[in-house]
Regions:
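N-terminal binding-site loop/beta-alpha segment at the start of enzyme catalytic domains
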Residues: 1-91, 157
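Beta/alpha (TIM)-barrel catalytic core signal, keyed to glycine-rich beta->alpha loops juxtaposed to Asp/Glu
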Residues: 2-9, 143-329
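N-terminal small/glycine-rich loop or linker at the start of catalytic domains
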Residues: 18-36, 94-107, 130, 135
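Hydrophobic faces of well-ordered beta-strands that scaffold small-molecule active sites
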Residues: 25-29, 59-61, 91-95, 134-136, ...
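Acidic-and-aromatic substrate-binding clefts and catalytic sites of carbohydrate-active enzymes
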Residues: 35-40, 64-72, 140-144, 171-172, ...
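Short, acidic/polar
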Residues: 38-51, 110-126, 174-178
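Alpha-helix N-cap and loop-to-helix initiation/capping positions
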Residues: 39-43, 71, 75, 106-114, ...
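Active-site groove signature of glycoside hydrolases
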Residues: 123-143
């Protein structure tokens, strides 16, 4: 039986999620990869235990995480039942719905029927009565925003979620959604979006600025650009790289000579700062006031330990920030 470290809250730093009362660890653990049916269950447990022992209290899931869809929630539910569940009140457990999940017209996008059915399924897979945050996973161009936001509000009213969040939204849609949720007295606290030195979409589509204006949290996924912002590709593409075995999330064509040159220059800057590239990349995100937490993925416990070091990343000078922008342009 797992017993959590008594020192688990001594090193991690926590940040308020927007203007809510909820505190997030500056580093959170995502279960997007490495928690599906093809992964080793004992390793999954080690990842979760290492995270929690080091103050990571936020575990991020979605209905379709796997592979297969639903398997990450099922496996995490087993970890809760066998070990972590006794610490439930110390955990922030989140899930999402919005992508294709089951056959027929009711298993996708943002309808009230889909979202509430999906949440029920997620709770059953994890063996939970509620999640801390229920997200709509992506914007739906067809379903009225009022219906989707109303479904999120119903999830809270029914006691199946404490807070709600939005994922992969842009600034203008966030502003409209936030106004609807405020009218419904629904506790909307967080946005989740892809953001890294190499991916500035949230800067271009207004999401980051709008989150700050509305005083809502922002948790960033793919902060290391699927491993590009690490030392893994400094000397080209390793044969055992996920690119070689699974090109769904990072394509080999992305790592052309220009990108590899960018990675090497950023690595040189990190070395000048006395840091690893990954530490600098995570620290760069956390230096933005709008960013509440960075969402890391891991296949080995040591990766979690390494990423937690980012909270003590040295402050950036204006010259360094300008150079990062120039290199990554």
């Amino acid at each position: 039986m797992y017993t959590a470290s008594k020192e688990r809250y001594t090193q991690m730093e926590y940040k308020r999620c927007g203007d809510s009362g909820l505190m997030f660890p500056k580093v959170s653990l995502g279960l997007w990869h490495n928690f599906g049916d093809t992964a080793n269950f004992e390793n999954m447990k080690k990842l979760c235990f290492t995270a929690f022992d080091n103050g990571i209290t936020q575990f991020d899931l979605a209905n379709n995480y796997g592979p297969e869809p639903g398997s990450a929630e099922k496996n995490f539910g087993r970890i809760l039942k066998e070990d972590l569940g006794v610490y439930r009140d110390e955990l922030i457990i989140t899930t999402k719905a919005g992508y294709d999940m089951w056959e027929g017209p009711y298993g996708n996008w943002g309808s009230r029927k889909y979202l509430l059915a999906s949440l029920d399924q997620s709770l059953k897979r994890m063996g939970l009565e509620y999640v801390d945050i229920f997200y709509h996973h992506r914007m739906d161009p067809e379903t009225p925003l009022e219906e989707t936001m109303g479904a999120l509000a119903s999830a809270v009213q029914s006691g199946k979620a404490i807070y709600v969040g939005l994922s992969n939204y842009d600034g203008p849609t966030l502003e409209k959604a936030s106004a609807i949720l405020k009218e419904l007295h629904c506790p909307f606290v967080i946005n989740q979006n892809r953001y890294s030195i190499f991916d500035r979409t949230v800067e271009k589509n207004g999401l980051k600025d709008m989150a700050g204006k509305l005083k809502k949290g922002l948790i960033t996924f793919s902060p290391l650009a699927q491993g590009q912002l690490t030392d893994r590709y400094l000397h080209g593409i390793p044969e055992d790289s996920r690119i070689r075995t699974d090109g769904r999330f990072l394509k080999e064509s992305t790592l052309d000579e220009h990108r590899l040159d960018q990675i090497r220059k950023l690595n040189d800057l990190a070395a000048q700062r006395g840091e690893k590239l990954a530490d600098m990349a995570l620290g760069w995100l956390l230096h933005h006031d709008e960013v509440t937490s960075v969402l890391i993925g891991a296949s080995k416990p040591q990766q979690i330990l390494d990423n937690v070091k980012a909270i003590s990343c040295a402050p950036f000078t204006e010259e360094e920030l300008k150079l990062i922008d120039e290199i990554s342009a």
